[in-house]
Amino acid sequence: MANIGKWNAPSATVTVLSTGLNSLANATMSAASSNIANQTNLDIYVDVEVVLASLSPTTGAFVALYILESIDGTNFPAQSDADLRLTTTQLLVAIPVGTTATTAQRVAARNIVIPPGLFQIKLDNQTGVALAASGNTVKFNAYDVNLNG
């Protein structure tokens, strides 16, 4: 049957943040990721996986991912972290960390819309504790929809 939308196979899983998360203090943002280029693939969606090495998050803990888009293909917004937190239009996703157990945490969010251009990501640690000295990652799996079935 023609004209049925189906998922396309996702792109390769890409680690967008890793060592920049090491020992990241609570209520602190990471440095921006390397540039993530979506000008060619023009993927629409991304699934995000955040792995936090062993920690004891507090009740209500979460991590937030902010997106910095380069509208002109060269320059990125230069907001302070405090201002970025007030700019909800640049909040990509907030992901709850649903346990306070002392263990590694693996949390994910699905079907997040991404821009058709160059962008970077920052992680805001709101877990109530500093992240571990190693083993923390943010990974993306980008994909789109085939509308020709």
Describe these PLM feature segments.
Residues 1-42, 49:
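Solvent-exposed, flexible loop/coil segments flanking beta-strands in beta-rich domains
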Residues 1-16, 116-118, 124-149:
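C-terminal interaction-tip segments
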Residues 31-36, 53, 106-111:
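Signal that preferentially marks extracellular ectodomain short beta-strand elements
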Residues 34-36, 78-81, 128:
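Intrinsically disordered, low-complexity boundary segments flanking structured domains
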Residues 42-52, 62-69, 114-138:
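Internal, hydrophobic beta-strand segments that form the core of beta-sheet-rich folds
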Residues 55-59:
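Short consensus segments that form the blades of beta-propeller domains
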Residues 66-105:
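Terminal beta-strand-rich extracellular "head" domains
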Residues 91-129:
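Beta-sandwich interaction modules
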